[in-house]
Amino acid sequence: MKTRRIMAVVLAALMMLSIIPVAFAEEISSISADAALSVRMDDAWAAIELAEAEALADNLPASDVINAVYTAALNNENVDADSFSDFTADGFFFTVNGMHCAYNYRLRNKIEANVTEEGSVTFNASNGKVVEMRDATSPNVLLVGPYYGGYDPTFTDQYRREATSIAEATGGTLTILAGHDATGPAIAAAFPDKGAVIYDSHGIASGTSSYLCLTTNQGITNEDYSNGWAVRSGNEAFIDGRYIENHITSALDNPFVWMAICEGMKLSGRGTTGYALLRAGCGAVYGYSQSVTFVGDYKFEETFWNVIKEEGTIAEAYATMVDVWGPVDPYGDAWPIVMSPVDDFPANPDQAQTVYCDWTLFGESEEPIALEGYTLSANEANIAVGETVTVKFNREPEDANLYDII
């Protein structure tokens, strides 16, 4: 009997061992396939970066460096031969086994690599101030600065000061994701519990979307690249609004997203980033139709945010900004564009826009006061073609606001 029991236990164990490979076969296969994609991606970029390094060592001009990189990519077996697109003076886009990639000479070779890492920081700017929020349900502010810390010295402290002043006005905290700490996952994780989000970075449009440029590809997956909501650029990466939409893990607080990046609202991008951010739970999104100048954007943002900090609406802030500086970058050809639930992506973003969004960051809520009665200055009017008639609507009480006029 003892022998039989032992044999039974052994047989059961063997049966369990035979089941284990079946249970994990699909998962192992998936991991192996993903690892294989990573190898192909890394091999392709190794060849591209070798060609770039050799061209730079020969002191070739930018156009020749780009051509050398293009030739290397074209001849690499891992690069999809028919995938090259969006050729510009700075580079081009392509795919590796369907995963989106980009080579941009300017971003790769005009950016300082040897800098003191700055990292991220969160601090309370409220000084004990308590403010009643309106459309944004959080007083906190997020500033994303991938090139902060010296990666690109053309980025100043303008948005540090602005973001700090917004947090001081709302009585909230300010979180700054700087340099390599501005990873895709970190940005998505920081979106919840924010009333205002500011991108201060480079931007680029490709295919049918517009992207925020990062100085690191840390945490971005092959799935992200395959879906096109992330683009690999060597050790760097770009992400669009769909990346945020698909990586946030909790509900957003209806924030306003200010994108101080180039091409965030470019026509070819079709508003993909803006629509994705709205679907994710943002209240409104601001960006530019073309490459914007630093000085032009700074003038726009200061005027715009001053109105917002005075409890104005986005429509009021936009109108004031345009009245002061005009409807286009005073030093370039970028048009400021707002997307919101009542402001669709324009058919032509390279022209003046009328903004209707009444989103307000904070301010005292209007107490609802019921309409008890009303009178009209005229009960009827005969109006001929081309004529107008004024009929006054007198409320009882005069400050009643709880009613609809149909």
Question: Could you tell me what each predicted segment is?
Answer:
Residues 366-398:
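Short S/T/G/P-enriched beta-strand
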Residues 75-142, 266:
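Structured catalytic cores of large enzymes
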Residues 19-30:
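Sec-dependent signal peptide cleavage junction
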Residues 37-56, 64, 70-73, 119-210, ...:
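A domain-level signal for caspase-like cysteine endopeptidase catalytic cores
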Residues 11, 15-19:
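Hydrophobic core
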Residues 397-405:
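Extracellular acidic loop/turn motifs
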Residues 256-368:
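Active-site-proximal C-terminal subdomain of hydrolase catalytic domains
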